[in-house]
Amino acid sequence: MRVDPHTFAENFIPEDHFKSQARARGVELGTVDTTPGAGAFLRFLASTLKAQSVVEVGTGSGVGSLWLFDGMLPSGTLTSIDDEMEHSQIAKLAFADADIAPSRYRLINNSVLDVISKLTDRAYDLVVVRHNPEDLSYVINEAQRILRSGGALVIDNYYGGGKVCDAAQRDPRTVALRDAGKIIKNDTDHWVSSL
């Protein structure tokens, strides 16, 4: 029996009980959460960067946050921004279930446009963007300002369900994702890009 390589990669590092439970809560609310494969990559990247301070745009159900906590330094702090109060509430529940101390996170309920510009310059090791692609150009510029030298920006679910690869797709969300990719790819003074 042949296994699809994408399915194999997505399930190579299985989610623990806390992530599965958070994901199930998120499905009920319709949250946008990181996939298991992308979550494993976020854990890897946070660990490689020895991330102390991380910003997450789009808390969802907290699945991506839990993956980030797995890779961050034990004293690391996550700032997660989501404009949906229900998302922050179920994420907080997921963090409590996983025994993540409240001192390790800030859940901010507001628009990323109202929050990210107030974050401290050069104070973060990693910025993960999971939703609001229409705001991506602005978030990319702000990420450049708030990231420390050697920090990383991740646009989770960049492919937009395959639409970014399909030139015939012209909806605003897909165009915003494509434009964000071009900004990062073309700004070689500030970014080293990869898909």
Where do the language-model regions lie?
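A short alpha-helical cap/connector motif
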Residues: M1-L126, P133-V154, Y158-L195
